[in-house]
Amino acid sequence: MILLYLISSIIFASALLINRNALINKLLVLGFLVLQISYTVFIFVHQNVTEVTYFTPDALAILMTVTLTIIAIPTLLHRYDYIYKEQDTPSNQGLYYGAMVIFVMALTAGYLASHIAVTWIFVEITTLSASVLIFHRRNAGSIEATWKYIFVCSISLVFVFIGILLLSLAMGDQYEAGMQYDTLIRLAPSLNPFWLKLAFIFIFTGYTVKLGLVPMYTAGIDAKDKAPTPAAALFSSVLMNLGFVGIFRMYLITAHSSIFGWVNTIILITALLSVFVATVYMMKVKNIKRMLAYSSIEHMGIVMIGIGIGGIGYYAAILQLILHSFVKSSLFLQVGHLYKTFKSKEIFAMGNYFKYNTSGAVFLLLAFFGITAIPPSGLFISEFYIIIALVKAHALIILIPLLLFLTIIIWAYGKNMFKILFVPPMNFDQTGIEKSNPYETLSHYLLLALIVYLGFFPPTTFVTLIQATIHSLPI
């Protein structure tokens, strides 16, 4: 079935690329969404059944794929280019949608990959397809962001490749057993600690470009800023999830080795530094898309603190990752409406949003509570669990600065968001303003509702999948 999914996705992408009819394009996008939903249902039913040796829908893969599919529906159906819609050529639109299809396909396959090299291959495919999306508007800013993204991602993925080679050295004479994740976990106690440490450092550093952590976070900021908002919605959620999957699968290997304590220390230091970096930039950022991008760094830092501290933090980290995906993607989609209204991404040029788009403004107000983990946001539950884990571990050296950083971030985020909602914009010409239809915000509300539901009323299946993801980790 995985081969059928991959081949069908490539056919859909190719058809979108060569087709010039708008109606057929819409039908092709709908057809791909039907394929994506069908395959998601298939892997949910066939959990842990390996296909063609290299793909296994385990609990983590299912959680990530379901999250991707839910978010892919509004992002693919969203009106992606408000301001330049009339200027877009049919070929440009086809290239955009074709790249989106390949991007979603690569994410799905990356989640499912059961071999460390196959994960690396599909992560590289996301880089290529994402670059097309970043380049979409073909102006000086998008060209610069595209080359920066390609350059930083290429270096980072070379790091991952070197890490894979070092991991093979750590296996010694057992290399012929293969590099499936299950095999590596089974062999972990006998892996050479020196080579395993080096392998982890390279793989962890390389995948931070996708996860959005220090040190390789920079390319992702520009990518989210310059890409069309639906693409940025995917970059800030499900693409970061793929980076997490790559790191987490390596983390599972080290969890069964003698270097596990050392790995947790590295993760905690990097995660706290990432939250610090996000805090610094959140205080001075003036661009709404960059503000949301730095907010993603903060949340990924919190996720990795949960992983590094262990205990209930494992469960909280997976929950935080999924809930963040829903709220952040919905926020980026709403930024499209903000840009449609104010013709700018600069916060000083926005204001009094309630006057121009009431449904969108109400959403932004609710999303503020959602993204800052203020009840009834489900992120309150995951962050509360992480704080409990830090208290139980007596990790005050992490807890105290983390709480300080989060307080500053809430203040900075609130200052900008309430300015957009209530303060009149500077030098804003109201003539010819394009109104948004309330129904266009419906998908944003549905994504926001999911974080309340999954946080406070999680279905048994959802909890079971998270528990299955972390069951082999030492509690």
Question: What residues fall within each predicted segment?
Answer:
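C-terminal ends of transmembrane helices
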Residues: 12-25, 73-87, 131-145, 210-225, ...
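Membrane-interfacial loop-to-helix junctions in multi-pass inner-membrane proteins
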Residues: 19-33, 59, 87-102, 117, ...
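Predominantly late transmembrane helices and immediately cytosolic-facing juxtamembrane segments
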Residues: 214, 328-334, 397-433
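Juxtamembrane/interfacial segments at transmembrane-helix boundaries in multi-pass membrane proteins
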Residues: 48-52, 159-217, 222, 244-263, ...
